[in-house]
């Protein structure tokens, strides 16, 4: 069995939301701590109960759960994206968008508007993921 990944903490997600809110002048306010706690644990549940070791799937689970939790007053989608990337980076996987950053992120964010499925999100991560040092 593969060693357990490094998980993203609730505190790290709160800090990411604070940064995102500051960038846009939106309020940083955690309005549902319980929902955020559950969302942050979602990839662990996928790892343990579904025995899914695919990091694109784990990142997708985190992104979908945090965005869906709507635990913050603002910036939930941007925070979800950064947390998912943070999960990958904590496990020595980079998301290397190169010169395609704006277009690639626009495509991913179509999930939040119902124009990209969860499978599409996982495929997006698989397309742009690279193990650190091998990108």
Task: Enumerate the predicted regions with their spans.
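FIC/Doc superfamily catalytic core
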Residues: 1-135
């Amino acid at each position: 069995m593969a060693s357990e990944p490094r998980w993203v903490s609730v505190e790290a997600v709160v800090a990411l939301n604070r940064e995102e809110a500051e960038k846009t002048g939106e309020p940083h306010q955690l309005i549902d701590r319980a929902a955020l706690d559950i969302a942050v644990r979602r990839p662990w549940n996928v790892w343990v109960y579904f025995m899914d070791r695919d990091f694109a799937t784990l990142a997708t689970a985190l992104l979908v759960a945090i965005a869906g939790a709507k635990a913050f007053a603002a910036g939930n989608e941007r925070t979800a994206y950064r947390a998912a990337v943070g999960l990958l980076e904590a496990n020595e996987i980079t998301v290397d968008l190169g010169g395609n950053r704006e277009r690639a992120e626009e495509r991913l964010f179509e999930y939040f508007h119902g124009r990209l499925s969860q499978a599409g999100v996982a495929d997006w991560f698989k397309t742009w993921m690279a193990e650190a040092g091998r990108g």
